Amino acid sequence: MANEVIEKAKDNMKKSIAVFQKELGGIRAGVANASLLEGIKVDYYGVPTPLTQMSSVSIPEARVLMVTPYDKSSLDDIEHAILASDLGITPANDGTVIRIVIPQLTGERRQEIAKQVGKLAEKGKIAVRNVRRDAMDTLKRQEKNGDITEDEQRSLEKQVQKVTDDATKEIDKLADQKSQEITQG
């Protein structure tokens, strides 16, 4: 039962890291990436709909995204949703598709994005620490109920701490890689 606590903590920390990686994928580094548009919701007949569910996104050139809506009547709504996002990109609507040229990043914009990566990393670490706290609370409860001894509790808490440290290092490593990718262009 105690090993289940460790395994559950590992699993939940891996999920937290996966969420962090997905969020990092949405941060642009001066090249076209379809995941850049994943978080955008379009008001489609009064229902907020993910852009990726109502259009196909292709990359015809290194710094160009092309959005082709399945329903041409939603073209203007898609354009407005992209403009309303805080991605710093401007869509060009030609009546059938929307082209988005990803601008070169300025030094100032690179620093802003690097700060955004830092905030995401902190959010990921908080999620990992919450998993750690839950695991520690479970171990304390088990010791209090007599399911495990005090020595077992201490040993398991050390294991949870090691898993937490490893997850935190992984998040730091991913954040550093993304920051370098952004600042070096």
Curated annotation (Swiss-Prot):
Region (Disordered): 138-185
Alphabetized Pfam families for the sequence: RRF
Coiled coil: none
Main location, first listed in the record: cytoplasm
CDD domains: RRF
Family matches, as PANTHER family: MITOCHONDRIAL RIBOSOME RECYCLING FACTOR PSEUDO 1, RIBOSOME RECYCLING FACTOR
Protein name as it appears in the record: Ribosome-recycling factor
Organism of this sequence: Lactobacillus gasseri (strain ATCC 33323 / DSM 20243 / BCRC 14619 / CIP 102991 / JCM 1131 / KCTC 3163 / NCIMB 11718 / NCTC 13722 / AM63)
Gene: frr
